[in-house]
């Protein structure tokens, strides 16, 4: 199945799986999705992920979701930049999510990274989504 916005699809799959208290969720594989999941893993929002190769040649990513006291670690996950309205920001104007308790995930010339990493690297970019 082809999706026009793979990041929104990934976010929706994670949100829906956590509402149903699923421990794992699968999504079609891509380098961009893997990069986004690597940021979520390094920030502690998911336990991990694994890429699964099928004999047909396509790949899937299995995401292991994270819970604390039975509640999902991700309270809110919202898409910011959409195909119809791209949102770009400079390093000076990077948004703080819930006063620094959450993160913004950005696509920068140096790769996909969290907002604090972008500040350290002094780069701006496209704000993909926010997590709290």
UniProtKB/Swiss-Prot annotation:
<comment type="function">
    <text>One of the primary rRNA binding proteins, it binds directly to 16S rRNA central domain where it helps coordinate assembly of the platform of the 30S subunit.</text>
</comment>
<dbReference type="InterPro" id="IPR035987">
    <property type="entry name" value="Ribosomal_uS8_sf"/>
</dbReference>
<comment type="similarity">
    <text>Belongs to the universal ribosomal protein uS8 family.</text>
</comment>
<keyword id="KW-0689">Ribosomal protein</keyword>
<keyword id="KW-0694">RNA-binding</keyword>
<keyword id="KW-0699">rRNA-binding</keyword>
<dbReference type="InterPro" id="IPR047863">
    <property type="entry name" value="Ribosomal_uS8_CS"/>
</dbReference>
<dbReference type="GO" id="GO:1990904">
    <property type="term" value="C:ribonucleoprotein complex"/>
</dbReference>
<dbReference type="GO" id="GO:0006412">
    <property type="term" value="P:translation"/>
</dbReference>
<dbReference type="GO" id="GO:0003735">
    <property type="term" value="F:structural constituent of ribosome"/>
</dbReference>
<dbReference type="InterPro" id="IPR000630">
    <property type="entry name" value="Ribosomal_uS8"/>
</dbReference>
<keyword id="KW-0687">Ribonucleoprotein</keyword>
<protein>
    <recommendedName>
        <fullName>Small ribosomal subunit protein uS8</fullName>
    </recommendedName>
</protein>
<comment type="subunit">
    <text>Part of the 30S ribosomal subunit. Contacts proteins S5 and S12.</text>
</comment>
<dbReference type="GO" id="GO:0005840">
    <property type="term" value="C:ribosome"/>
</dbReference>
<dbReference type="Pfam" id="PF00410">
    <property type="entry name" value="Ribosomal_S8"/>
</dbReference>
<dbReference type="GO" id="GO:0019843">
    <property type="term" value="F:rRNA binding"/>
</dbReference>
């Amino acid at each position: 199945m082809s999706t026009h916005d793979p990041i929104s699809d990934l976010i929706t799959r994670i949100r829906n799986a956590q509402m149903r208290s699923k421990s794992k969720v699968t999504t079609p594989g891509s380098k961009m999705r893997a990069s986004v999941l690597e940021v979520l893993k390094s920030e502690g929002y998911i336990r991990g992920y694994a890429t699964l190769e099928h004999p047909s040649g396509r790949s899937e990513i299995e995401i292991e979701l994270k819970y604390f006291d039975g509640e999902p670690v991700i309270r809110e996950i919202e898409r910011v930049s959409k195909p119809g309205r791209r949102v770009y920001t400079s390093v000076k104007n990077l948004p703080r999510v819930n006063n620094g308790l959450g993160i913004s995930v950005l696509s920068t010339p140096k790769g996909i990274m969290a907002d604090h990493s972008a500040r350290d690297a002094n780069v701006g970019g496209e704000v993909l989504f926010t997590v709290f």
